[in-house]
Amino acid sequence: MNIIKQPLRVGVGGPVGSGKTALLEALCKSMRDTWQLAVVTNDIYTREDQRILTEAGALEAERIVGVETGGCPHTAIREDASMNLAAVEALSEKFGNLELIFVESGGDNLSATFSPELADLTIYVIDVAEGEKIPRKGGPGITKSDFLVINKTDLAPYVGASLEVMERDTLRMRGERPWGFTNLKSGEGLQNIIAFIEEQGMLGK
């Protein structure tokens, strides 16, 4: 009897404009030569993120599936994750050797979380342009995600945000939970996220 190993499912959430899709593009391009990947994106009325990732060449088009949630995007990743679970299952059946599936949420507030049925690991993305106060506002995305990404560090001087203050507040809110600054334009911080996914997700084990 062959036991089919299920792919690791990593949920990527965060507010609109924080850089979720840019992070996914960077992760896919950096990890696709090592691991068998696929992506599920969520948008309310369109499949815009699916299109962006496909046109960017993040993965082959058939490995990127867009889900139109048709309503509150939080519901589709938490209370009723059936559409996303179906997309994950379809990708797993289509590509029998999948090792990692990213599930991108459709733009969240700070209280959004992924259903444990849908995501084995969760990454939450915020950005410096939202203001240095964001980490101290808390919410499950800030405090409970498995890895917190603070993106767009290059914008700090332009928006009057102190990275030192953000670091202090993040450490206070998250304790020992891992997190990192990123500038996806330059690739700063990307390898830390990849290492986290590979180690905590026990890829290849």
Curated annotation (Swiss-Prot):
GO terms for molecular function: GTP binding; GTPase activity; nickel cation binding. Homodimer. UreD, UreF and UreG form a complex that acts as a GTP-hydrolysis-dependent molecular chaperone, activating the urease apoprotein by helping to assemble the nickel containing metallocenter of UreC. The UreE protein probably delivers the nickel. It is found in: Cytoplasm. SUPFAM superfamilies: P-loop containing nucleoside triphosphate hydrolases. Pfam families: cobW. GO terms for biological process: urea catabolic process. Keywords: Chaperone, Cytoplasm, GTP-binding, Nickel insertion, Nucleotide-binding. InterPro entries: CobW/HypB/UreG_nucleotide-bd, P-loop_NTPase, UreG. Facilitates the functional incorporation of the urease nickel metallocenter. This process requires GTP hydrolysis, probably effectuated by UreG. This is Urease accessory protein UreG. Its main location: cytoplasm. It comes from the Bacteria. One of its GO terms (cellular component) is cytoplasm. Transmembrane segments: none annotated. Belongs to the SIMIBI class G3E GTPase family. UreG subfamily. NCBIfam families: ureG. The keyword Isomerase does not apply. Gene3D superfamilies: P-loop containing nucleotide triphosphate hydrolases. It comes from Escherichia coli O157:H7. GTP binds at residues 14-21.
